[in-house]
Amino acid sequence: MILACLFGARLGVAADSGPAGPERWIHPAFSAPSLQLPGTFDQQTVVVLGDGRLMTVHPKGNATVISSDAGRTWSEPRPIRSDTTPVVPTRGPLIRTREGVLILLFQVMAGLESRWDEAKRDWTPAFRSDLWVTRSRDDGKTWDEPQRPFAGVYGTITSAIQSRSGHVVVPVGVALKEPGRWGTYAIVSADAGLTWTRSNLIDLGGNGHHDGAIEAAVTEFSDGRLMMLVRTSLDRFWEIYSDDHGYNWREWRPSGLDAGAAPGYVQRLASGRLVLVWNRLNREAGAPSPKSASSASYYYGARGQRAELAISHSDDDGKSWAPPVVVVRQTKTSLSYPCVLERNPGELWIWTRYGSSPPVYLSVKESDLVDRVKRVPEFKR
């Protein structure tokens, strides 16, 4: 399965060895891919169809568009369902299994604007974000009736995989109360999205409407075990492991990878190498990131920066990682929510899904991760 989820924009930036415009610097080992996503910074996804074309969910939701030229241009929207039906699919992660089944996960929300009680530092009873699923077995020509496997308050999904065993594994945040925070489940399907099982809860504490265990990235190791890298407000990812296809996550520990309060993206390549792109805790040559105020509703004492994205790789299933290298930095607006797609074996596309406008689109060969992706001097305006 090839999956990428993103916040995209219509215009891209060409990568070169110097500043790409007055505010952005891109590592010289990276070039610009053909990918130019439709729409604005809204949650979208892109998958590779069986014939090599690309498909993404339209930024307005309830429709798909297809590219036959590697993402340069996109077709007119094809509706998923009638706008008059009781449940209309919104934007969300789109998965294509190896069997050719498309799975669209989406949320139906209520009470979003008043979701947080600042005085109680907790979620309001009116806030709902139910998780829904619809499937297509003919590459989007027709879709099944949407099903709601889980009701409640579920958060943004930033990563999903189909493991070699065929299980579809999707980390998803869930709103927890008293105090208000996020926890994380994995939802697992052994039948290409027809039915779903929810794992045990990952709860790391916290208090804030962006605090806790949130927006996890998931990958598979060579021995079939799964790992989630969970976004936290604790100055680093937490590593959570499963040895039973994602149904139970029994081993939890703080990662050796420092990270700010932002999600990363980890991708297992065809070669077996793991690639991670993320916002480190501090800028490469800057002062330590300040902690947020304890009264901030987002986090409780979190730190981080979104001015730089770093990349690293592992050749031993995450036991060790190559020294992180900054691949893009921006002096004013932020860079965050990265995504990695192995478009072809050894060809990586990387882009940002939130923060900067236009988004960053990067391309690099896997061989260059070892040979050319080295630390370069700090960018000077």
Map each language-model feature to its residues.
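Bacterial N-terminal signal peptides
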Residues: 1-10
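Asp-box/BNR beta-propeller blade signature and adjacent active/binding-site loops
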Residues: 15-381
